[in-house]
Each structure stands twice: as structure tokens, then as C-alpha cells.
């Protein structure tokens, strides 16, 4: 088989619900919360997470950015490109970055520095997956889904060359799938 399940659909749903409860508690007094999804990989995680956050007295808005450091490779190139920026101001608002995976930490660090210059009231991150062993820089992750080993993960929005995003679980892409 070309992939091995790391986290099942049920495990992911349970963890995302837990994160939603934490975020609901932490932002219950916020007036304006902007959830910034990093495309494309975080779209499934963000969709499920948003439905797990219940803030009836908060103006919750969704924004998206597209940032890339991969291309069609299985490891980060280290070159960060902003392909789509925010469409509205985040000044004075509470901002929560929704990211699929942190490998080296370089992309998230760069993004946090960029958004911090836009003067949000607060800036935090919710990350589905972190490769702790691969971190080159420490980045603050307030809401963590799962720590994972140094393997290439697919499914639940994460891809390899635009394939496998639709899988309902998170799996390891085996080397025979991409090495020729």
C-alpha cells in the first residue's frame, strides 16, 4: 500500500472539537476575531474548526492567505512566496492563523512577523500538525492538533502535488509513491 494511516477520521474530529472548545473559551470576550486560513492545506481543518467554535457575542470573520514553500517537493524549499494576501485590515483585531502543518517553522515565523506589523490586537496560531524534530526556529503555537514524526503527511487537506487532499484521515505518503 502507498500510504499508512497516522490519525483516523475519528481521532481528527475529536481533536478538532477539543481545539474549538479551547478557542471558544479563550476568545469569549473578544469583539472581533479574524480566522486566517493558510491555503490550500488548511482548508479542511479550518472548515471543521470554524464549526467547532461558538462565539455568539463576537464578530468572527474569515480571511485567507496563500503562502508556499513547497511546490511539488516533499520538503520545504525555504523560499517563502506570498501568493494571496489578506483582503481586509486586521488592525486592532484578534487574529488566529489556521495552518495545516509546521515543518521547519520558517514559513509560520515569517507569516507571524508580517501580520504583526499590521497591528492586530493579538496574534496566535492554531496548527493541525507539527514536526517538532524538524523545527529550525521556535514558533509559538497556541492551539496544537498533533505532533508527528519526520514523515510526509497527506490527507485531510494536505497534498502531494495536488493529490490526496480529499482523504478523510491523515496518512504517511510512502516513498515509492514519489521516488522514481
Curated annotation (Swiss-Prot):
Cofactor note: Binds 2 magnesium ions per subunit. The magnesium ions are essentially bound to the substrate and have few direct interactions with the protein.
Enzyme class: transferase
Associated pathway: Purine metabolism; IMP biosynthesis via salvage pathway; IMP from hypoxanthine: step 1/1
Binding site for Mg(2+): 159
Alphabetized UniProt keyword annotations: Cytoplasm, Glycosyltransferase, Magnesium, Metal-binding, Nucleotide-binding, Purine salvage, Transferase
Keyword rRNA processing: no
Subcellular localization(s) per the UniProt record: Cytoplasm
Known cofactor(s): Mg(2+)
Entry's Gene Ontology BP terms: GMP salvage; guanine salvage; hypoxanthine metabolic process; IMP salvage; purine ribonucleoside salvage
Keyword Nucleotide-binding (UniProt): yes
Domain of life: Eukaryota
UniProt: GMP binding residues: 40, 99-107, 131, 159
GO molecular function: guanine phosphoribosyltransferase activity; hypoxanthine phosphoribosyltransferase activity; magnesium ion binding; nucleotide binding
InterPro entries: HGPRT, Hxn_phspho_trans, PRibTrfase_dom, PRTase-like
PROSITE patterns: PUR_PYR_PR_TRANSFER
Family: Belongs to the purine/pyrimidine phosphoribosyltransferase family.
Free-text function comment from the UniProt entry: Converts guanine to guanosine monophosphate, and hypoxanthine to inosine monophosphate. Transfers the 5-phosphoribosyl group from 5-phosphoribosylpyrophosphate onto the purine. Plays a central role in the generation of purine nucleotides through the purine salvage pathway.
Protein name: Hypoxanthine-guanine phosphoribosyltransferase
Amino acid at each position: 500500500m502507498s500510504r499508512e494511516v497516522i490519525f483516523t477520521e475519528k481521532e481528527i474530529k475529536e481533536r478538532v472539537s477539543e481545539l474549538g472548545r479551547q478557542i471558544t473559551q479563550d476568545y469569549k470576550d473578544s469583539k472581533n476575531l479574524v480566522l486566517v486560513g493558510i491555503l490550500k492545506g488548511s482548508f479542511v481543518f479550518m472548515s471543521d474548526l470554524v464549526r467547532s467554535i461558538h462565539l455568539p457575542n463576537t464578530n468572527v470573520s474569515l480571511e485567507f492567505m496563500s503562502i508556499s514553500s513547497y511546490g511539488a517537493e516533499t520538503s520545504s524549499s525555504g523560499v517563502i512566496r506570498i501568493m494571496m494576501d489578506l483582503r481586509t485590515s486586521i488592525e486592532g483585531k484578534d487574529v488566529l492563523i489556521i495552518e495545516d502543518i509546521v515543518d521547519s517553522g520558517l514559513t509560520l515565523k515569517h507569516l507571524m512577523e508580517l501580520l504583526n506589523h499590521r497591528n492586530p490586537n493579538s496574534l496566535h496560531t492554531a496548527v493541525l500538525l507539527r514536526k517538532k524534530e524538524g523545527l529550525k526556529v521556535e514558533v509559538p503555537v497556541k492551539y496544537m492538533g498533533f505532533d508527528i514524526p519526520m514523515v510526509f503527511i497527506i490527507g485531510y487537506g494536505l497534498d502531494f502535488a495536488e493529490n490526496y487532499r480529499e482523504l478523510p484521515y491523515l496518512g504517511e505518503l510512502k516513498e515509492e509513491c514519489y521516488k522514481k
